[in-house]
């Protein structure tokens, strides 16, 4: 039984679930992911581990409600259990030996960036955090980031909180001013990561991107998560999810990411209709 021991709404569309999964908590590392299934007939959802407590035996996941699967997951309450919770999967983010790192997160991708920033902080690395959101209402995990970052910058598209603009603006400024980052680690929408790489590459600042494309089985068998990295086919679930940002074909990844949008919309509509029937 993978029981939900705590539930927290981070903003109107983003939820955090803390789930009792002692075996996963024992092995989990920052950057790895799990595959969760809310109910027996639910779709398999890959979610990067947002936190873990080895002593309590719990693992935290953070997700945005966007489709039928996440709607079903979001319907579960404290004390209820998810049907499947498999992991940890993928390779952990490599942070050993890093002295000065900039972690750049966007939207719900900040949930993935946070445990990496925390792990860096715990090993004594200087951490600069830059996160971006569309507006103030969508800001998440601010206190947690401030606790583990030596410097922390919030950007919003409309300027309703923090500084107005996109994450690449302060990143470019820091690099030009001589921040001397050993590495930039970025997690968020594909378009954001693409432009982070466009910002860092001219300065030859190593940039690691966390790729979470279509994932089904999580073991490399289905091939749904394939990416082109350095001209070669890679599988995010077993070769990643972290890759050298300079080598990733973002245009291909973005095209593949839109392939199932009509099916997702249909599934979401069907789930909404079922929920309406239950209410009636």
Q: Regions from the language model: what does each represent?
A:
Residues 1-80:
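Ferredoxin-reductase
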Residues 235-239, 243-280:
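Short Fe-S-cluster ligation motifs
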Residues 42-51, 89-99, 237:
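Short, Lys/Arg- and Gly-enriched loop/turn segments at beta-strand edges
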Residues 68-216:
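FNR/FR-type flavoprotein reductase catalytic core
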Residues 36, 84-85, 227:
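A generic structural signal for residues embedded in beta-strands
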Residues 112, 190-191, 212-242, 270-276:
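Local cysteine-cluster metal-coordination motifs and their immediate loop/turn environment
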Residues 39, 87-88, 230:
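Short, surface-exposed secondary-structure boundary micro-motifs
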Residues 6, 51, 154-156, 209, ...:
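Structural signal for conserved beta-strand scaffold positions within catalytic alpha/beta enzyme cores
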């Amino acid at each position: 039984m993978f029981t939900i021991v705590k539930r927290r709404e981070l903003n109107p569309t983003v939820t955090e679930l803390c789930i009792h999964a002692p075996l996963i908590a024992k092995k989990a590392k920052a950057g790895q992911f799990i595959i969760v299934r809310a109910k027996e007939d639910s779709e398999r959802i890959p979610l990067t581990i947002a936190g873990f407590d080895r002593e309590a035996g719990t693992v935290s996941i953070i997700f945005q409600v966007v489709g039928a699967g996440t709607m079903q997951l979001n319907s579960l309450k404290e004390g209820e259990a998810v049907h499947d919770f498999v992991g940890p999967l993928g390779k952990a983010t490599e942070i050993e030996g890093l002295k000065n790192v900039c972690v750049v997160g966007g939207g719900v991708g900040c949930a993935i960036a946070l445990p990496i920033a925390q792990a860096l902080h715990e090993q004594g690395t200087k951490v600069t955090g830059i996160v971006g959101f569309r507006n103030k209402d969508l800001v998440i995990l601010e206190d947690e980031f401030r606790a583990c970052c030596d410097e922390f910058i919030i950007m919003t598209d409309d300027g309703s909180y923090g500084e107005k603009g996109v994450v690449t603006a302060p990143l470019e400024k820091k690099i030009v001013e001589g921040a001397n980052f050993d590495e930039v680690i970025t997690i968020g929408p594909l378009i954001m990561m693409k432009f982070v790489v466009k910002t860092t590459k001219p300065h030859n600042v190593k940039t690691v991107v966390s790729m979470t494309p279509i994932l089904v089985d999580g073991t490399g068998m289905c091939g749904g998560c394939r990416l082109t990295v350095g001209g070669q086919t890679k599988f995010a679930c077993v070769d990643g999810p972290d890759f050298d940002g300079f080598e990733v074909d973002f245009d291909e990844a973005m095209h593949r990411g839109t392939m199932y949008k009509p099916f997702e919309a249909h599934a979401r509509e069907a789930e909404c209709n079922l929920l309406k029937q239950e209410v009636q």
